[in-house]
Amino acid sequence: KLVHQHEYEKSSAIVNDGGGMYVYLNTYSVEVQKYAPPQYTLSAIYYVVHTSHYQAEIMENKLTVNYDANYSLATLIKSSNMMNPSPSMLALIEASESKSGLFMSSTDSAIYTLDGALKRTPSLKNTRNLPIHRKNILMYDLADAMFMAAYQQHFDDIVVQ
């Protein structure tokens, strides 16, 4: 599933032939690691495809995301309405931006040429359990696409009772 795309400008000083960056999620690779609502952990394989005159490759990565539905947007709205019947939209936005309830770790698996030949296998470097902020659209959308593939609903639609 195409999760993100960015087309490079042809008139750019760095890139003169266009191209772009495309991020794909292998929805068949999504695995449930933990199911203990409101806590969830999923892992999946995703690909970052770079196409330009200076970089043409496919990077394969494994992503593990920990979800805490106590911080889903629907839960934040519900709890905000319970505490204050007319919450300020600004307070709600600040709360949603400060904690998304998502944490990730990623591992580089392999790098391929555009025709699928193995280019190199990077040393396995894991990132620590880093927060995914809603402003980080690429990683947030990737985490949400994983949740959608596993549970057929968006993470931010989950309401914790």
Residue locations for each model-derived region?
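N-terminal secretory-pathway/extracellular module detecting exported/lumenal segments
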Residues: K1-K62, Y67-Q161
